[in-house]
Structures are given as structure tokens and as C-alpha cells.
Amino acid sequence: MDSQPVDVDNIIDRLLEVRGSKPGQQVDLEENEIRYLCSKARSIFIKQPILLELEAPIKICGDIHGQYYDLLRLFEYGGFPPESNYLFLGDYVDRGKQSLETICLLLAYKIKYPENFFILRGNHECASINRIYGFYDECKRRYNIKLWKTFTDCFNCLPIAAIIDEKIFCMHGGLSPDLNSMEQIRRVMRPTDIPDVGLLCDLLWSDPDKDIVGWSENDRGVSFTFGPDVVNRFLQKQDMELICRAHQVVEDGYEFFSKRQLVTLFSAPNYCGEFDNAGAMMSVDESLLCSFQILKPAQKSLPRQAGGRKKK
């Protein structure tokens, strides 16, 4: 699959050429280049742990959903790799118009900076979901169905969760009633699809709910919701300080829950053109102080800095 030599630097340059262009301009890579990105990134994901152990300083981003020009804005504010270390929390494809550019740039950066750039799996990095919500159709329209299957093979090897400096637990969705020790995550074998129930499903699908105690059924029809008591117990047991997750649109791009023990990040401003939400990126410094950079939904706005919370 990697027979023809492919220049990742050249791919990144071409993907970044549209900076400053009118949003929506496409970058059409060669099919063999995209296949190379999938194959090479997949081999890196498999070599690295399914539960990443990362160090601050790092910038964390939530859902992107094919909003490629907003991804470029995030990098403009946070610094293009390798200027900053990054962790993305999943949901790169579907819903937005440019899932292909979005995932290709992220995979290219993963290949170029494997120890400084990390992407987790979201519930949309799953064939049964992105078959329905736009990515399959985009692949079919711009390339072919076989390429969509190549992406599926790559997504099936993405890491599931990350821990930053042993204190900040990151995933796309949330906690699971089945999760008692980190070893359970480490034991999950890849490649794997996302099952309909169980630990892996919950980590990518569950949601916090301030109005409940314990666990409850989820309106999504998948996984569960969990109350502040669940968050508090989990952090105490694991000797951690914060859960950082994505998966839900929040008006300001970030939203705290359970006395600031959990934060939801969402990084696609003006989501789908239907929500008037901001997008946010969380910067974690060496002392684990968290601060937020906000992408306003209005097009030509500057980021505003929001104060964070000091961690021990």
C-alpha cells in the first residue's frame, strides 16, 4: 500500500495552502496519498498504547466534525504543530462539509510529529455511524467507497483515552459503570469496532447529567448518563483531579460540571451552521493550570482568553 513514496511535508503544505482563502475551498489530495496517511498513521496508533500517558504542557480540543476552516483557526490560535503539543478528543468526521481535509491534516500531523500530536477515537470514528452522518457520502462523492473502508481500518486502531500527568483523564464521551481500573482499557485489543454496549461503548458515548445520582439511561439510546457523585467517586478512587471530555455542544465551547471536576470541550463553533455556540481549546500548562482559548462563532473574531482553575 505504501509502495509509492509519499511526501508528508508536501501534503501538509498543500492542506495549509487554503489558509486565508474563503472557507469551503477544497484540497484534493491524490487517492494514493490518502491511503498512505491511513496506513502509516494506523501503524503508529498500533505501536502506541490504547491508553495514552501524556505530559503537559498540551492543548486539548473537542469535536471538529469536518469544519476544516475552524480546525485551521484552532491551530492559528494555539500554534501550528510542533509549536504546541495537541490532544484531540475525537469526532473529526461527519456533519461538516470537509471531513476529508480535516482527518487528512490530523493524520499527517500524527505521522510528522508522533510524540507531540495525539488524536483519540470519537463515536463518529466508527463505520456504522459515519456511514450515515456524512463521511461515507463525502468519500464516495470525492473518491470512492473503497477509500472509506481504508479509513475504517485506520479508525479501528485509534487510541481510546489519555491520562495527562496522572491527573487529567481524557476521553470522547465519559465514564462507564464497568470501569474500575485503567488496566481494563489497556487490555482492549485493536483493531476493534465500537460495540453497542460495554466499556468501550461508554467511553465514547456516555454523558454527564447534573440532575441525577448514579447512572441512568441516555436519551441518545446508547450507553448511560452519570451524576456528579459518579465523577467524584471515580476521581477519588483513581487519585485524579479532572475528567476532560467532548461529545456535546456547549454554548461557550467549554462547560464545567460537578464542581469543576469534569469539563466538556467542543471545538466546532457555529456547529453545523445551526447552533450559535463558540468553540474552545483547553491549554494545560506544566503546573496543570487549565485555561481556555475561545473561538467565537462570528467569522473574523479574535480569541478571548478565559481564566482557568489552578490544579495542585
UniProtKB/Swiss-Prot annotation:
Task: Identify the taxonomic lineage of the organism of origin.
Answer: Eukaryota, Fungi, Dikarya, Ascomycota, Saccharomycotina
The record's catalysed reaction(s) read:
O-phospho-L-seryl-[protein] + H2O = L-seryl-[protein] + phosphate; O-phospho-L-threonyl-[protein] + H2O = L-threonyl-[protein] + phosphate
Where does the chain bind Mn(2+) 1? Answer: D63, H65, D91
Question: Which organism encodes this protein?
Answer: Saccharomyces cerevisiae (strain ATCC 204508 / S288c) (Baker's yeast)
Instruction: Tell me how the cofactor is bound.
Output: Binds 2 manganese ions per subunit.
* Name of the featured protein: Serine/threonine-protein phosphatase PP1-2
Q: Give one GO molecular function term.
A: protein serine/threonine phosphatase activity
Q: Which PROSITE patterns match?
A: SER_THR_PHOSPHATASE (PS00125)
The record's annotation in SUPFAM superfamilies points to: Metallo-dependent phosphatases
